[in-house]
Amino acid sequence: MQAKVKPHPKFPAIYEAILEDGAQRLATKNLAPGRNVYGERLIRYEGVEYRIWDAYRSKMAAAILKGLKTVPISPGHKVLYLGAASGTTASHVSDIVGEKGHVYCVEFASRAIRELIDNVCMYRINMSPILEDARFPEKYSLFITGKVDDIYCDIAQPEQAKILADNADMFLKNSGWIMIAVKAQSIDVTKEPTEIYNREIKVLENRSFNVREVVHLEPYDKAHVMIVAQFR
């Protein structure tokens, strides 16, 4: 059986691939045909190339497979991505927003951003790499044009929710959305994960966010949750 691809029943620009053995995987339409980013499989179906989206490598994909009901990132959106690393999830976000959208990729590690530029951004017209620390959004405000529709945050910092909220105050439009992947051990190894998640949720609520969903990411990521919230 040839691999097949069909649109996801809920989320625009996200797809479901049915592989030769019947296994189902998430996929996105490849904005840079012929190139993969992290060794993911490329599938050609009805003249279009898709990239398999590995939920063990991407917390956003894991959250979708764990039943996330809201994925605010959509075609045409401007997205601020905090903690883009070498571009695994950011490249799929690039696929989703498409040529009419844009992804501003903030990353502090120089090695990671070199890989992001050389392997990803060079081949995608809708990505801007920014070598800066997400704790100081004022340092990169000149690189971001207007307000963004969404912020995606995946940074290993103790004050993750505060950092995201500081960025939202500066860059996120009213009624915009955020997705934040919280890793308990990055915040406090001495506390129970549930206590940490609740603390980060409280920070967001105190900073004008309406938390809509909290999804645990096991078995794809241990002691992680994905929080989806709307601003003001």
Predicted regions and their residues:
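Conserved class I S-adenosyl-L-methionine
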Residues: 74-85, 102-104
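Conserved SAM-binding loop of SAM-dependent methyltransferases across substrates and taxa
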Residues: 85-99
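Conserved alpha-helix/loop element of class I SAM-dependent methyltransferases that forms part
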Residues: 9-11, 33, 37-40, 54-78
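Helix-to-beta-strand junctions that scaffold the AdoMet/dcAdoMet cofactor pocket
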Residues: 74, 97-98, 171-175
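S-adenosyl-L-methionine
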Residues: 104-160
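N-terminal auxiliary segments of SAM/dcSAM-dependent transferases
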Residues: 1-50
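Glycine-rich helix-loop-beta junction characteristic of Rossmann-like nucleotide cofactor-binding loops
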Residues: 68-74, 95-96, 144-145
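C-terminal substrate-binding/active-site "lid" region of AdoMet-derived donor-dependent transferases
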Residues: 112-115, 165-231
